């Protein structure tokens, strides 16, 4: 699996922006990706040193479209802690 296939997109929320000062960044990743793959992908894409990776599965919410009930897809969130002094340039200025 390619590194860019594992990391789907960065998560920009109020909570994740607050954690950036601690060197923690949040990403949406593939459901089948493990912590080792996520760490290698972040290091390859952004050229930083990853200290810790925490992952969690997020269940999809129920949604209605008129009388029909559907469900959004489940997804996986990864919170990556970088070595002190490292930062990801994509998130600069947030």
Swiss-Prot record:
GO terms classed as biological process: translation
Disulfide bonds: none
Pfam families listed in its UniProt record: Ribosomal_L23
GO cellular component, one term: ribonucleoprotein complex
GO MF annotation terms: rRNA binding; structural constituent of ribosome
InterPro entries: Nucleotide-bd_a/b_plait_sf (IPR012677), Ribosomal_uL23-like (IPR013025), Ribosomal_uL23/eL15/eS24_sf (IPR012678)
Keywords (A to Z) from UniProt: Ribonucleoprotein, Ribosomal protein, RNA-binding, rRNA-binding
NCBIfam families given in the database record: PRK05738.1-3 (NF004359), PRK05738.2-4 (NF004363), PRK05738.3-2 (NF004366)
Function: One of the early assembly proteins it binds 23S rRNA. One of the proteins that surrounds the polypeptide exit tunnel on the outside of the ribosome. Forms the main docking site for trigger factor binding to the ribosome.
Similarity-based family: Belongs to the universal ribosomal protein uL23 family.
Subunit structure: Part of the 50S ribosomal subunit. Contacts protein L29, and trigger factor when it is bound to the ribosome.
Designated name of the protein: Large ribosomal subunit protein uL23
Organism: Symbiobacterium thermophilum (strain DSM 24528 / JCM 14929 / IAM 14863 / T)
Annotated gene: rplW
């Amino acid at each position: 699996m390619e590194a860019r296939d594992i990391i789907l997109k960065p998560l920009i929320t109020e909570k994740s922006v607050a954690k950036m000062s601690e060197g923690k960044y949040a990403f949406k990743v593939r459901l089948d990706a493990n912590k080792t793959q996520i760490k290698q992908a972040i290091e390859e894409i952004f050229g930083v040193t990853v200290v810790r990776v925490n992952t969690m599965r997020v269940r999809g919410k129920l949604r209605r479209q008129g009388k029909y009930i559907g469900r959004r897809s489940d997804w996986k969130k990864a919170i990556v802690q970088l070595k002190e002094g490292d930062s990801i340039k994509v998130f600069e200025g947030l």
